[in-house]
Amino acid sequence: MSKALRTLALSGLVLVGLSACVSVPRGQGSGAAVVEQISDSARQGEAARQAWLQQHPNWSFQGRVAISKDRNGGSGRIDWQQDGPRYRVQLSAPVTRQSWVLTGDTTTGAGRLEGLDGGPRSGSDAEKVLLEATGWTIPVNQMPDWVRALRIADAGAARVELDAAGRPRTVQQDGWTIDFLAWTPASADQPELPQRIEARYGEAKVRLLVDQWTVSP
């Protein structure tokens, strides 16, 4: 079987498995509006949020994700665990009981994908491994910062729009447009964190709905 046919087959298997899962609901305009003027208190609050998150590099979240490209797509559960630069991401389809695990390191960029027919795939570029195995375009090395809306302004973003609380609302970076549509409220244990994110790159789209955040002390 040719490489192209193998990629198409693997992508189809993953998307079919994920399509059996619960879908991620589309937004109904719950995101905060973009504003031109940010108050000093809002800027200070966002700076404090960023500083707190930088001091807490170990975290996890559970939620739902939908991935699509052109007319192909699927959705499923996602469990993301981050330990400094190292991550473990599990995508699962409860109905079919299929799951896929991506592990990697954002410092080196390397990654390993398990759960596909034909055995694990690994390489020095996790994004390339994922693209070749599934056909998905996902910026996995940027995702740890993106999902927390962390260091957006310092990461070479082409455009950053803020809401009235000083938080990122829309970001354009590396060809992606990321919309932060809803946030979990701050608690005694952690600051506000994104709850619903939509990212687009051409025909590729990733929609994420976080059910629970956990940040280690």
Curated annotation (Swiss-Prot):
Gene3D superfamilies per UniProt: Lipoprotein localisation LolA/LolB/LppX (2.50.20.10)
Endpoints of the signal sequence: 1-20
Keyword Membrane attached: yes
Subcellular compartments: Cell outer membrane
Lipidation (N-palmitoyl cysteine): 21
Gene designation: lolB
Domain of life: Bacteria
GO BP term, pick one: protein transport
Membrane topology, record value: Lipid-anchor
Record note on quaternary structure: Monomer.
Name of the protein described by the UniProt record: Outer-membrane lipoprotein LolB
Lipid attachment locations (S-diacylglycerol cysteine): 21
PROSITE patterns: PROKAR_LIPOPROTEIN
Coiled-coil annotated spans: none
Function, in words: Plays a critical role in the incorporation of lipoproteins in the outer membrane after they are released by the LolA protein.
Keywords from the UniProt entry: Cell outer membrane, Chaperone, Lipoprotein, Membrane, Palmitate, Protein transport, Signal, Transport
Family, similarity comment: Belongs to the LolB family.
GO cellular component: cell outer membrane
Keyword Transport among record annotations: yes
Primary location recorded for the protein, binned into one broad class: membrane
